[in-house]
Amino acid sequence: MSTRESFNPETYELDKSFRLTRFTELKGTGCKVPQDVLQKLLESLQENHFQEDEQFLGAVMPRLGIGMDTCVIPLRHGGLSLVQTTDYIYPIVDDPYMMGRIACANVLSDLYAMGVTECDNMLMLLGVSNKMTDRERDKVIPLIIQGFKDAAEEAGTSVTGGQTVLNPWIVLGGVATTVCQPNEFIMPDNAVPGDVLVLTKPLGTQVAVAVHQWLDIPEKWNKIKLVVTQEDVELAYQEAMMNMARLNRTAAGLMHTFNAHAATDITGFGILGHAQNLAKQQRNEVSFVIHNLPVLAKMAAVSKACGNMFGLMHGTCPETSGGLLICLPREQAARFCAEIKSPKYGEGHQAWIIGIVEKGNRTARIIDKPRIIEVAPQVATQNVNPTPGATS
């Protein structure tokens, strides 16, 4: 796992007390409207959805719309589909460049959950806090934009426009669009009994970034210092930051290689919320049962010490730019997990078999006492700092 030197505001002629996360009251994808409320709010959009297009396309082409993270819209010509997603988050780490990378990875992740590996175009949506000084704005916002741009280039796409507005809180997001043939994406509705559930990033990012901020808040740090050291927190924070900035593109490609039946990415509703949403979309009468929870090292202990206030053990803790939850044939899952670790994909990363697909009523649950898999930090050094003079 690559590491990055801690962001030093003074390097950019900012006050040493500058913290990007102070320009929002919510963190990351913890900004999401609760799932049950969202479904009610979207009911009016779902009425007569796609009715106009039926006269052109009938039901021959697969389509997705309201209620899922990505839309799949058949185009009127050429047997192609538009696959598109939009997302935005609030700052979750204090490093502006890495926050830009995380925001971009978070937008692209919904395409990757469809097995799409190529993005044709990105737009960036940026809310600049009106509480920033001119100096803070002029130093920090270019770093965020550079991080977003670099992540887009890593994904093989480019940012061609967007929208920038003033806002009380910093808002970071975008739109990702591609045009695909039917064999270039995987519909998220084909899970069958006997499949297994695979997760491609560990849980606990929200816990890691929260407790990292607690290092500066003695009354909160005192609650957890018996179960975790400052070094543990720093390592978990680094691991969380690099994981959030990592694209799910490799996993998306391997979904095709190993015949994935369905997938979603894990973000603001936590692993259980997203598993439940995916289960509801299945054509077959199945349910998902989660037995294992891979968690960043020491973050499970921190969560327990806090009385499970994060909801980590219950699967409701929000994640930001989390991994893919993939339904794979049982005989393919171990090979998927081995392949994604291969050095041919850069550093190689872990994936875990965390549960099963069984006959059921399109629900998802975590067993009463899931096995917690402590995911140790993978520490290596690699300079991912942009050149200060290039973006300030």
From Swiss-Prot:
Question: Where, per UniProt, does this protein localize?
Answer: Cell membrane; Nucleus membrane
**Chief place where the protein resides:** membrane
Q: Which reaction does it catalyse?
A: hydrogenselenide + ATP + H2O = selenophosphate + AMP + phosphate + 2 H(+)
> Which sequence positions carry the modification called N-acetylserine?
2
Spell out the disulfide connections.
none
Q: How does it sit in the membrane?
A: Peripheral membrane protein
Question: What EC number(s) is this enzyme filed under?
Answer: 2.7.9.3
Summarizing the function annotation, the protein's role is:
Synthesizes selenophosphate from selenide and ATP.
As for family, the record states: Belongs to the selenophosphate synthase 1 family. Class II subfamily.
Name of the protein: Selenide, water dikinase 1
